[in-house]
């Protein structure tokens, strides 16, 4: 990821990069914004017998076969019932928006994550928790910048996840289609809507960071892990900008996958991703050339070989 709030804010702006007339109703707008959460809801779908398959789907969609994934998604929209096609297209374009932000933003996040873990050997097995804390801080930063200094008290993260039964049904069909055709994973269509509901439920439970209920959950999780992932996902209530995490001082950093050197702040990475989305979504809609759409870059920002196989987490 970036995390929930940043993806939502990105969707609110990336929707304006779509060709005129693509989004024609409020429900299509909701579907597009929800699509901006990408495969991430499946990471939160722990209250299902299919938890391992759902987690695996979220992982493999992020790391591999991106061109086939989006080709299948586009094909899936073409097979929907005519009354559902526009809604499915809106969701698919939102999922593409999630991917474009991820591939631009993740090198920024991973550069910090790798540096923090390398500097403290005790964090070696806690990369996911470090990743979550960085992205939570970026959520806090972007919420303040995009919504006039707002905090998660003003905009609770769970409230940013909006859907309808119809969107869940159509999006579920598309995600099930991609899971089976591209990755050979059997995910019934109903699992997507349940995953979204579980994502909402979890954020209601853990927010805000530092609350009594969050501390209690963290203590329980601490019986199993050295550091709490759920505590890392929760957002701080603060009016102080996370300047260091967002690199607002424009220190030099290096893309860990390409070695490209930059002094961009995170807000500048966000804006660069918006420009990228405008170009990428035009290719997706007009040409269907998915190699050109993805450039064989996965959601982490790692450039893969032409077969786009990659079998490990960063």
What are these regions (language model features)?
Residues 1-94, 99-314:
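N-terminal leader/auxiliary helical segments
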């Amino acid at each position: 990821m970036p995390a929930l709030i940043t993806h939502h804010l990105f969707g609110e702006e990336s929707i304006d990069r779509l060709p005129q007339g693509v989004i024609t109703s409020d429900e299509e707008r909701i579907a597009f914004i929800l699509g901006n959460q990408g495969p991430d809801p499946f990471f939160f779908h722990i209250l299902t017998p299919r938890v391992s398959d759902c987690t695996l789907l979220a992982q493999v969609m992020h790391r591999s076969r991106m061109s086939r994934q989006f080709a299948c998604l586009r094909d899936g929209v073409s097979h929907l019932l005519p009354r559902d096609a526009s809604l499915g297209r809106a969701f698919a374009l939102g999922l593409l928006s999630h991917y474009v932000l991820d591939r631009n933003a993740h090198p920024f996040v991973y550069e910090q994550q790798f540096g923090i873990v390398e500097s403290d050997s005790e964090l070696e097995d806690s990369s996911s928790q470090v990743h979550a804390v960085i992205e939570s801080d970026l959520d806090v930063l972007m919420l303040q910048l995009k919504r006039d200094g707002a905090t998660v008290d003003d905009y609770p993260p769970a409230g940013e996840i909006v859907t309808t039964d119809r969107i869940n049904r159509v999006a579920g069909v598309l995600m099930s289609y991609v899971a089976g055709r591209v990755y050979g994973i059997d995910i019934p269509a109903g699992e997507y809507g349940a995953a979204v509901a579980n994502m909402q439920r979890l954020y209601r439970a853990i927010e805000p960071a530092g609350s009594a209920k969050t501390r209690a959950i963290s203590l329980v999780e601490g019986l199993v892990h050295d550091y709490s992932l759920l505590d890392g996902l929760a957002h701080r209530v603060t009016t102080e900008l996370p300047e260091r995490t967002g690199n607002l001082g424009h220190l030099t950093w290096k893309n860990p996958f390409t070695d490209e050197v930059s002094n961009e702040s995170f807000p500048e990475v966000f804006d660069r991703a918006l420009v990228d989305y405008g170009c990428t979504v035009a290719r997706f809609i007009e040409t269907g050339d998915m190699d050109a759409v993805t450039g064989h870059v996965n959601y982490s920002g790692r450039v893969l070989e032409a077969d786009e196989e990659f079998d490990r987490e960063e």
